[in-house]
Structures are given as C-alpha cells and as structure tokens.
Amino acid sequence: RCGENNCVGHDDLDVVFQFDKQGRILTQFGAGMFEWPHGIDVDDDGNVWVVDARGNEERGRGHQVIKFSPEGVVLLRLGTAGVAGRTRTTLDQPNDVLTAPNGDIFVADGHPGNGNNRIVKYASDGRYLMEWGETGSNPGEFRTPHALAMDDDGLLYVGDRSNRRIQVFEQDGTFVRDFYNMGRASGITIHNNKLYVADSESRYGSNPGFRRGIRVMDLDTGFVIAFIPDPDPTPGGTSAAEGVAVDNEGNVYGAEVGPRALRKHVAR
C-alpha cells in the first residue's frame, strides 16, 4: 500500500508487483492510480484485477475495481472513479474481486460494517448482472464482506469478517452454508480442496477464543487441520496477514499489512 496503509501522497510508488520464486521483481505498475489498494485477483489469462477501497472525487480515484493486462495496461474499470454509491455503476469502499472460470466477475462491496454489504456480479465485459446482500447477520446478509474465493464446484466463499464467519453461495446468490470456526476473515483462498483463511483481527477483546493467523480447513470434513500463528504475538493493531495465497508446492504466502511484508511459509 505505497509504503504505508494508503497511497495518498505517494503517487510515485507502484502498487502491483510481480516477483519470481527468488523474490526478484519482474514487473511493477499502478503508480498514481489508487487511494487504498485492497483486494487483488489474477484471472486465467493473467490479467490483474485490483480493488481501490477508498475514494476521492476531486482526485478522480477510488471506489473502483481496475483490470490490468499482465504488463499493466488498463483494460476495464468497474465503478465510477471517486464516487461512492450503491447503484449499478457505483461502488462504496469495495473490498475484493474474484473472476470465475467463465469470466463473470464478483465484487465484495462495503468495507464499513454498516456499508453496502453486498456482492455484485458482472459479466466479463463489465456489464452489471445482479447483486445480493444487505447489512445483517442472517444468511445472505453481511457485515464487511472482506474476501472472496471459489472452489472447484463453482461455489463462492465470502469472508464475512465482522460476522466472524465464512458464507458459501451458488453463483446466483443462493445461500448454501456457513462456517464459524475460521475467525475474522480478512483474506481467503482455496487450494486442493482446502480453505485458507487469513485472520488479521482476532485479538484481545475483538474475537475472544481466537488468535490471529492463517487457518486451514479441510472442506471435506469442515475441520481446521492447521494453523499458522501471527509472527507478531503482541496484541496491538492489525499486523498479521490480511491476504493469503498458496502455490503449487503447497507453500503459503501471507500479505502482512503492518510489517509491509510478504511472508512465505514453506510446506513440510
């Protein structure tokens, strides 16, 4: 996030970086385009989708999802730059984006607990298709839908962070089930039928009984089978991984906002 927790005043710093396995930078882009870069997804064609979770109308930035080519060329924008709203053409502090295998696009919209709290679905060309969700704690309702993932059956997983659960939906918004044993989900991903959840907020007074870190669930059983604790055990502000990814060798990567680091946890 431009060396801090947002990009305001840091227009010279790139936002997206591609590294090789040794950590060397291969590509970087996005300088001067974002207020608060938040969620990221890479589609099957290698295009990079980045969410800007805050906005400023005067600067004409934010409240958008931007699609880049692998080289950093802007291909598509969802939402109206700098304009917050809840319409077919506006977003308000979107959190995450996910592209389905058929090209459909899902956006988790609404960072505040009392915000938009909806999932918006678009066609691959950016046409609005549908949406579902409102503020609440019933099935299909949200309080900060912070992260998205999709399993091999095409089910959509939503990290409903302030409700301390994962909700699962069909792609038309039909509720399937939910989980309450994964903490406060800031980032989620699915690999080899395992659900990985980055919980950056469970700490003293915030989510009693849970610790910050990355939890791993076996989706066949619904049981948590592994836990990677936050490397920083102190109970201060958010420092643990907010984003999580897994490579083909099973190594787990945590995107840590506080330390401004990408930490690799090697599979054994």
Predicted regions and their residues:
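Eukaryotic scaffold repeat domains enriched in small/polar residues
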Residues: 1-268
